[in-house]
Amino acid sequence: MEDVTELVLKAQKGDEIAMENIVNMFRPKVSAISREYFLVGGGLDDIIQEGMIGLFKAVYGYKPDKNHSFSAFASLCIEHQIQT
């Protein structure tokens, strides 16, 4: 299996299979973060959708030359998207 950084770089260049693999890899993380923000009476699906938008933003905003992992960057982007 490819390294997540390699997948991100491919996705940034328009590789749909790479993006699909990233989404599948990070779906559990998006769901876990989304559940932290879920309130009774609210829509968990809506929160998860916002989290996925955050994941997409992370993919296109990630710069591997910075000294942080994609996973950490993605978590921040997911949380920020859900909070806004």
What are these regions (language model features)?
Residues M1-T84:
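Alpha-helical promoter-recognition and RNA polymerase-docking modules of transcription initiation factors
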